[in-house]
Amino acid sequence: MQFSCDPDQEGDELPQYEHIYQNDFSYRKHKKQKEEDISICECKFDFGDPDSACGERCLNVITNTECTPGYCPCGVYCKNQKFQKCEYAKTKLIKCEGRGWGLVALEEIKAGQFIMEYCGEVISWKEAKKRAQTYETHGVKDAYIISLNASEAIDATKKGSLARFINHSCRPNCETRKWNVLGEVRVGIFAKESISPRTELAYDYNFEWYGGAKVRCLCGAVACSGFLGAKSRGFQEDTYVWEDGDDRYSVDKIPVYDSAEDELTSEPSKNGESNTNEEKEKDISTENHLESTALNIQQQSDSTPTPMEEDVVTETVKTETSEDMKLLSQNSQEDSSPKTAIVSRVHGNISKIKSESLPKKRGRPFSGGKTKNVAQKHVDIANVVQLLATKEAQDEVLKYEEVKKEAAVRLSSLYDEIRPAIEEHERDSQDSVATSVAEKWIQASCNKLKAEFDLYSSVIKNIASTPIKPQDTKTKVAEAGNEDHIKLLEAK
């Protein structure tokens, strides 16, 4: 996306700030990375393949973690230390018409490429709120405070990098990402798409409006929201007036469903059942008829329902008391306004549902109109072992069962170790849990899945290849008297 900026226009009156190349910690000391928390990748550098040195397939790159110098197997050839080495893309600070200063690319930037770090003063959220109020009181228009984690923020107003000049856009070509660098969480600017030279860089501020002046957005995008934070709930509640009948709050457009009966849109089944979309269309087409004949519905509710009423699909049913039913009946008879039509329609639907038997729960429909039968019980290993004739087969299944139990116990104990950090840091737990503990959790989860796979594979293999233990005479006689009992077939 091209913006209205001239890279050849240098401009003047650069805002006063201190340029820094890494975050400044004033209220606390820099975290010292513990050796047990260092994440070591498994990359091996190949001189014939330059991308082998911690490229896109590096485990640390995948988890947004930079390699620690001295611990990476690729050594000095490691390419996953861009934050530490300040390997930024070439950019230029320019003056944008009507939008202050901005940053443009001076080279071709690939999608996903690291552009630069957003640096500033790392402060607590309490201090960030104080500074925001101070900036507003003194009329500071350009405040650069962004969220770092649940307890800290980055303020680039007085100290910062060139990333502080990147403007907002409703259709951005960049985005912010959090990376773990030597034990600290740092924010980087990355390209969302390929960016050509002389193109302005922009990312979505995700501004949340809580009151005060409304700042008009000047990004110029086709789908521009008009104001910063226009999509936030507070902005919409303060700006727009919701009138009766506004389709943005229409109940018909709100998907109400029971989680136990979560139905997906599918093709009509072979037995003639219509899909969810067809039922909703019938519901909408029927409402117009119900509104025009609201008083008639009140009288017909106790009698046999008409074909038109049978097409109405009620998604949620609430049990009403007899007093509520009488109140609805009185309201529908006293007033013939549009409001009465709505009340009468609801009353008619409730009376109709009360007089009829409730529909049975249907299974979740799948493609082709077939219903998937989900198993409700786990495999009973004890019963499986009794069916196996050889001692070797029984011992093998029991061995894998014991391994599965040990893996489950190990995973449960690790969760008890991680849980305090999750409860303390809530949504930012991924930034606070030690890397070594996270690696143990992943390893324990994989071991549990492998143990389950080995167990069930052993069961299937032994049942298919091992003769079934013959049943005694008493069991056969008991089965002969029960026609519905499942009988085992023995291979001869």
From Swiss-Prot:
Q: What happens when the gene is disrupted?
A: Late flowering.
> Does the keyword section mention DNA damage?
no
Q: Which residues form the AWS domain?
A: 36-87
GO MF annotations, alphabetized = histone H3K4 trimethyltransferase activity
User: What Gene3D superfamilies does this protein's entry cite?
Assistant: SET domain (2.170.270.10)
Q: Which residues form each disulfide bond in the chain?
A: none
Q: Where does the SET domain lie?
A: 84-206
Outline the extent of the Post-SET domain: 213-229
Catalyzed reactions per annotation:
L-lysyl(4)-[histone H3] + 3 S-adenosyl-L-methionine = N(6),N(6),N(6)-trimethyl-L-lysyl(4)-[histone H3] + 3 S-adenosyl-L-homocysteine + 3 H(+)
One CC-aspect GO term = nucleus
**Which GO biological-process labels does this protein carry?**
DNA repair; flower development; methylation; response to UV-B; vegetative to reproductive phase transition of meristem
Question: Ranges of Polar residues compositional bias?
Answer: 266-275, 291-306, 328-339
Basic and acidic residues bias: start-end ranges: 277-290, 317-326
Q: What class of enzyme is it?
A: transferase
Which keywords, in A-to-Z order, does the entry hold? Answer: Centromere, Chromatin regulator, Chromosome, Flowering, Methyltransferase, Nucleus, S-adenosyl-L-methionine, Transferase
Question: What is the protein's major site of localization?
Answer: nucleus
Q: Where is this region: Disordered?
A: 259-340
Q: Which family does it belong to?
A: Belongs to the class V-like SAM-binding methyltransferase superfamily. Histone-lysine methyltransferase family. SET2 subfamily.
> By what name is this protein known?
Histone-lysine N-methyltransferase ASHH1
List the source organism: Arabidopsis thaliana
Lineage summary = Eukaryota, Viridiplantae, Streptophyta, Embryophyta, Tracheophyta
Q: Gene name? A: ASHH1
